[in-house]
Structure formats: structure tokens, C-alpha cells
């Protein structure tokens, strides 16, 4: 039985993916159930918040046996390197010499261009496009339908809002939104 950390919508999607790809049954773990779990075994992250995903991955590393899952409907380039515990869903396309870190989620219909590097536990939501040569830091959240043009760097812990078009580097910890994407002002 595979343990899925999380019990929301994404966790339920991960359960379906595990059943399709691995043919195994799953147990969804709420935060309380996760805290009470002492024996881990095979585990998949069902968490969509990149910062939470990064913290849980770090906490369970060496205890849980994180599974790397690639949907058969994904088109993963033969020179793409995929880290431990990453999940690649249906419709994802990676081209040549892409490096995907540990615990990464590439959700439905994401495209990642040549020579891009995605840091640990980043979450790339449905329909996002990452052009060639992009560096995405650890714990980055890229919103649904966002576009990042070639050669840019998205710093650790940054957030790219849904539908945004990123045309400049994004510093660590900053949230950007809009077309072109600009830093959100703090309240």
C-alpha cells in the first residue's frame, strides 16, 4: 500500500495516478494521520503548495521511500533526468537535457524546454510553459497557464501567478503576477 501525503484534491489525483501507473492501492494521509504515522514505506507527495511540499519532503527524507511516477501519456525526452520522488502527469512534455529535481510535481500538460533545470519540490501547475534554459529554484510554485521565457532564473521559494508571462528573472521568495509579470506589492 502506497501512502499519499495529503488528503485534498491533488492527493486524490495522485491516488488515481498511482493506481494507473503502478497498479497499487493507496492510503491518503491527512495532516493528523501523517503526524501519527511511524512506518512509511512507499510514499507519494499529494501536496500542491510548494513550500509545504519542500518541508514535508525534507522531514521525511530517509524515512519514506518516495516513488517517482511518470504517466504513460507524458512525453519525457530521453535525455531528461528525473529526481527521486517526482511526479509527471498526463500530457507533460520535456525536451532535451532537462533536469528535474527531487519531489517535483509537473501537473497536466506542462511543457519544459531544453536545458532547463527544476529545483527540488517545485510545483508546476497545469498548462504552464517553461521555455529553454530556464532555472527554477527549490520550492517554487508556478501557476496554471503561466509562461516563462527562455534563459530566466526563478529564485527559490518564488511564486509565479496563474496566467503570468515572466520576462525577467524573479528573485527568491518573490511573488510575480500579470503580463508581463511584476512583483506583487506587500500590504
Model regions: which residues?
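Structural signal for interior beta-strand "rungs" in well-ordered beta-sheet cores
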Residues: 68-184
Amino acid at each position: 500500500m502506497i501512502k499519499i501525503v495529503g488528503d485534498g484534491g491533488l492527493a486524490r489525483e495522485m491516488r488515481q495516478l498511482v493506481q494507473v501507473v503502478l497498479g497499487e492501492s493507496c492510503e491518503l494521509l491527512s495532516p493528523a494521520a501523517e503526524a501519527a504515522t511511524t512506518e512509511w514505506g512507499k510514499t507519494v507527495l499529494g501536496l500542491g503548495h510548494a513550500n509545504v511540499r519542500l518541508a514535508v519532503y525534507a522531514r521525511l527524507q530517509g524515512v519514506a521511500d518516495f516513488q517517482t511516477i511518470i504517466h504513460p501519456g507524458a512525453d519525457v525526452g530521453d535525455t531528461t533526468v528525473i529526481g527521486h520522488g517526482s511526479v509527471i502527469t498526463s500530457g507533460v512534455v520535456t525536451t532535451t537535457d532537462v533536469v528535474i529535481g527531487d519531489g517535483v510535481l509537473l501537473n497536466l500538460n506542462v511543457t519544459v524546454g531544453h536545458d532547463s533545470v527544476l529545483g527540488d519540490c517545485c510545483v508546476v501547475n497545469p498548462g504552464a510553459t517553461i521555455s529553454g534554459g530556464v532555472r527554477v529554484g527549490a520550492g517554487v510554485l508556478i501557476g496554471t497557464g503561466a509562461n516563462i521565457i527562455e534563459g530566466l532564473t526563478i529564485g527559490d521559494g518564488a511564486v509565479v501567478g496563474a496566467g503570468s508571462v515572466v520576462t525577467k528573472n524573479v528573485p527568491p521568495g518573490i511573488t510575480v503576477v500579470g503580463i508581463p509579470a511584476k512583483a506583487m506589492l506587500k500590504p
